């Protein structure tokens, strides 16, 4: 049984489909969860707004060092940091602009780097957990996803390197590797697909919560597939 009692967890991207599931699982396990929000409208769909165990931090851009520092500075007993925030786009490389490339790198790789760095600084040599979100195209060659795959490959490499760097201090760093998640957006985009093969956000949240928990006593430096049958 997972137990986060007395522990604080940062969850970026916490208002999205997967992020909300992670927040819900963590508060069920007793965590105080800090959720940064950049676009205020995102809170309208966030089911845990106003929950006594959730701290919402509005107006924070995770691509800016100062905003990330303010987020982690608001914690007092940080134990884990879960980085779900990111973005997706695809298309032939010939049609991919430099702006699109840099946008995806910032959304996926830069935000992950800044949050990992600030989490390590905040933990300050103490025990903790970091969980990143990579993606299957970063590991399995996939056409028309050059920019997206590269940005998530950066997340994967960051995870593996940081896991070695922080091992002695007891900070376990891992990443989950999803393929297609069963969300309303994905169902609408792929109406003829086998939706039953896709893992739900709640199922993936279970894996994330374990990796972020004190009960994860040995797993570090892992890129954990959460594909389901997809």
Cite the ranges covered by each PLM segment.
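Alpha-helical segment proximal to the catalytic Tyr-Lys
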Residues: 121, 164-168
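Conserved glycine-rich cofactor-binding loop
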Residues: 15
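Residue(s) in the substrate-gating loop at a strand-loop-helix junction
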Residues: 135
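Active-site helix of classical SDR
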Residues: 116, 151
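C-terminal helical subdomain
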Residues: 168, 175, 183, 193-230
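Active-site loop-to-helix junction immediately N-terminal to the catalytic Tyr of the SDR YXXXK motif
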Residues: 96, 141-149, 161
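Substrate-binding pocket helix/loop in short-chain dehydrogenase/reductase
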Residues: 92-93, 100-102
């Amino acid at each position: 049984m997972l137990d986060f009692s007395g522990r604080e967890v940062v969850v970026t991207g916490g208002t999205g489909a997967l992020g909300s599931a992670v927040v819900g699982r963590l508060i069920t396990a007793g965590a105080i969860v800090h959720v940064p929000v950049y676009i205020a409208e995102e809170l309208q769909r966030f089911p845990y707004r106003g929950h006594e165990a959730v701290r919402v931090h509005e107006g924070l851009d995770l691509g800016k060092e100062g905003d990330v520092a303010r987020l982690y500075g608001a914690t007092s007993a940080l134990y884990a940091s879960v980085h779900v925030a990111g973005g997706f786009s695809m298309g032939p490389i010939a049609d991919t602009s430099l702006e699109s490339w840099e946008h995806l790198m910032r959304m996926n790789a830069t935000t992950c780097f800044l949050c990992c760095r600030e989490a390590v600084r905040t933990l300050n040599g103490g025990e903790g957990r970091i969980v990143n979100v990579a993606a299957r195209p970063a590991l399995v060659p996939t056409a028309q996803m050059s920019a997206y795959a590269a940005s998530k490959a950066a997340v994967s490499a960051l995870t593996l390197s940081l896991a070695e760097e922080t091992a002695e201090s007891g900070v376990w760093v891992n990443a989950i590797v999803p393929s297609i998640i069963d969300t309303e957006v994905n169902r609408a985009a792929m109406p003829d697909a086998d939706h039953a093969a896709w893992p739900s956000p709640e199922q993936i949240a279970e894996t994330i919560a374990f990796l972020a928990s004190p009960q994860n006593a040995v797993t570090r430096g892992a890129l954990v597939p959460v594909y389901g049958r997809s």
